[in-house]
């Protein structure tokens, strides 16, 4: 990819030299945060590497918690400390509340109606955010849908119990989360477990689309660094994402159309799912909600809900299998609280401090989004005495914060015990642990993700003993990751479940 960038720049350098040398802000560079030296035209692009979160963490050791870079024509500031993250997300939250979506995902009209891409000042964003907060992810809404989650956990336990050898843990958790999202939204299941005879057609295509979307969004795009190249789509990312994202939109559109036709029947009985509630809202006057907005909202929820929680659960199992003593502690706690029940109740979570500590430690050690969704400075402002020009892209490196030795004792070690004697949580107020973000742009699905992370880990650990597949015992091998929308394992976890 780097070769492609250099070749493209070589052919088109004459078009971008003047453009790339403009000052990053409207009133001049001023006292910018420190940063590494830059190459002409491309700036610091080559320093990102294949794992930008790790490359930026290394640079931050030299240039500090507020570091400036030039990525092509984009001026970027990287935040690498809890104090600076609080400044950006809380104290200056309105200035930095606009998301900075990659050009490749600004497709099919999604940017005009997506809760993930609209600025916080947008009336549509405010409307969708209110619906998500009050109707989808409120305590009452989640209480009303707890049976749906319990059933998905039961099916996960049943599938694992049928496995007679090594199984792909990440694939199983992805299937569980995908079916949970579709059941919650549409009262249907879209994927099957690996031993199903019907694992074909829509099932395989859905996995392909979600995996491709999360992978391609994480690929550095020359069109983001040099927007004048955007019409040419030099890496084909826009074309690929249009296909995969468009396919998910078509799938959701078909489910919505089926429901709309069914609702017109005289004998129709309402479904107890989110789509029914959203369509009811669209027919009322309070929200002025369109079917198109419902479609794009559902796709956003499916992508985010299917991938990140599944990946985090897989990482949890990796660390517990690499640390049998931690797994034994967790199993003992589950046995004492859950007893002979095979499926944990969500009400049990508050009685399981070691389970809670384990989930927190996984989110610290393997943050699902190592670089939180980038923000854009709506106006020139100051942070820590430095000028942040208007239109600066802000990255918050949660991976760096989570492994900072000045914050965490033994940060490179997996130790759930570190959370047993403090009240640190991941709900956005403790900036040393913000895997879901904070402030206006905090992940609206956090309450659902938290419930499922705890319950999936508990289900897998309470009902089964585990062994790593022979030849995969290396910690280095198991911890290799791939940067993307969610931080995925490079080599899927294959482990052998033993029914207890």
Curated annotation (Swiss-Prot):
SUPFAM superfamilies reported in the protein's UniProt record? Cytochrome P450
Name of the protein in its database record: Carnosic acid synthase
**Residues annotated as transmembrane:** 4-24
Q: Which InterPro entries match?
A: Cyt_P450, Cyt_P450_CS, Cyt_P450_E_grp-I, Cyt_P450_sf
Q: Which gene encodes it?
A: CYP76AK6
- Top-level class of the enzyme under EC nomenclature: oxidoreductase
- Which is one GO molecular function term here? oxidoreductase activity, acting on paired donors, with incorporation or reduction of molecular oxygen, reduced flavin or flavoprotein as one donor, and incorporation of one atom of oxygen
> One of this protein's GO BP terms?
terpenoid biosynthetic process
Name the chemical reaction catalysed here. 11-hydroxyferruginol + 3 reduced [NADPH--hemoprotein reductase] + 3 O2 = carnosate + 3 oxidized [NADPH--hemoprotein reductase] + 4 H2O + 4 H(+); miltiradiene + 2 reduced [NADPH--hemoprotein reductase] + 2 O2 = miltiradien-20-al + 2 oxidized [NADPH--hemoprotein reductase] + 3 H2O + 2 H(+); ferruginol + 3 reduced [NADPH--hemoprotein reductase] + 3 O2 = pisiferate + 3 oxidized [NADPH--hemoprotein reductase] + 4 H2O + 4 H(+)
Cofactor(s) recorded in Swiss-Prot or TrEMBL: heme
PANTHER family the record matches: CYTOCHROME P450, FAMILY 76, SUBFAMILY C, POLYPEPTIDE 5-RELATED, GERANIOL 8-HYDROXYLASE-LIKE
Q: What is its EC number?
A: 1.14.14.61, 1.14.14.-
- Source species of the chain: Salvia fruticosa (Greek sage)
Task: Give me the residues that bind heme, please.
Answer: 443
CDD domains attached here?
A: CYP76-like
- Membrane topology for this entry? Single-pass membrane protein
One Pfam family this chain carries? p450
Q: Where does the entry say this protein is expressed, by tissue?
A: Mostly expressed in young leaves, particularly in glandular trichomes.
Q: Please provide the record's keywords in A-Z order.
A: Heme, Iron, Membrane, Metal-binding, Monooxygenase, Oxidoreductase, Transmembrane, Transmembrane helix
The entry assigns this protein to a family as follows: Belongs to the cytochrome P450 family.
Q: Principal place where this protein is found?
A: membrane
Q: What are the subcellular locations of this protein?
A: Membrane
A single cellular component GO annotation: membrane
Q: Pathway, according to UniProt? A: Secondary metabolite biosynthesis; terpenoid biosynthesis
């Amino acid at each position: 990819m780097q070769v492609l960038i250099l070749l493209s720049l070589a052919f088109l350098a004459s078009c971008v030299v003047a453009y790339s040398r403009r000052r990053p802000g409207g009133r001049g560079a001023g006292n910018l945060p420190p940063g590494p030296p830059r190459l002409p035209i491309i700036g610091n692009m080559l320093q990102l590497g294949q794992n930008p979160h790790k490359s930026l963490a290394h640079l931050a050791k030299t240039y500090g918690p507020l570091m400036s870079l030039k990525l092509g024509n984009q001026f970027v500031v990287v935040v690498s400390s809890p104090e600076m993250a609080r400044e950006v997300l809380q104290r200056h939250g309105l200035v930095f509340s606009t998301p900075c979506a990659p050009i490749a995902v600004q497709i099919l009209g999604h940017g005009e109606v997506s809760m993930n891409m609209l600025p916080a000042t947008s009336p549509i964003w405010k409307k969708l955010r209110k619906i998500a907060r009050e109707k989808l992810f409120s305590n009452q809404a989640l209480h009303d849908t707890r049976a749906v989650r319990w059933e998905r956990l039961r099916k996960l336990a049943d599938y694992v119990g049928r496995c007679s050898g090594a199984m792909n843990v990440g694939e199983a958790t992805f299937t569980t989360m995908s079916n949970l999202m579709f059941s919650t939204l549409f009262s249907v299941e879209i994927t099957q477990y690996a031993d199903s005879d019907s694992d074909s057609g829509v099932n395989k295509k859905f996995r392909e689309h979600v995996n491709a979307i999360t992978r391609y969004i994480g690929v550095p795009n020359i069109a983001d660094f040099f927007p004048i190249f955007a019409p040419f789509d030099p890496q084909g990312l826009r074309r690929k994402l249009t296909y995969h994202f468009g396919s998910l939109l078509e799938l959701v559109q078909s489910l919505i159309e089926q429901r709309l036709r069914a609702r017109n029947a005289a004998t129709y009985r309402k479904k107890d799912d989110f789509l029914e509630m959203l369509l009811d809202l669209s027919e009322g006057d309070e929200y002025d909600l369109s079917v198109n907005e419902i479609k794009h909202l559902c796709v956003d929820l499916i992508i985010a809900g299917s991938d990140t929680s599944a990946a985090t659960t897989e990482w949890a199992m990796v660390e517990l299998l690499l640390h049998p003593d931690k797994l034994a502690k967790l199993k003992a706690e589950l046995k004492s609280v859950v007893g002979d029940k095979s499926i944990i109740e969500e009400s049990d979570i508050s009685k399981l401090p070691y389970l809670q500590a384990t989930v927190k430690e996984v989110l610290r050690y393997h943050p699902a989004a190592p670089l939180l969704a980038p923000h854009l400075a709506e106006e020139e402002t100051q942070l820590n005495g430095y000028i942040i020009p208007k239109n600066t892209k802000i990255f918050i490196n949660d991976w760096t914060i989570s492994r900072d030795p000045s914050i965490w004792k033994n940060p490179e070690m997996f130790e759930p015990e570190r959370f047993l004697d403090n009240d640190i949580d991941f709900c956005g107020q403790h900036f040393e642990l913000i895997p879901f973000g904070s402030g206006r742009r905090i992940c609206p699905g956090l309450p659902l993700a938290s419930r499922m992370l705890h319950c999936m880990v508990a289900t897998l650990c309470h009902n089964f003993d585990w062994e790593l597949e022979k030849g995969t015992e290396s910690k280095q091998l198991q911890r290799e990751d791939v940067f993307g929308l969610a931080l995925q394992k490079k080599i899927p976890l294959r482990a052998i479940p033993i029914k207890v």
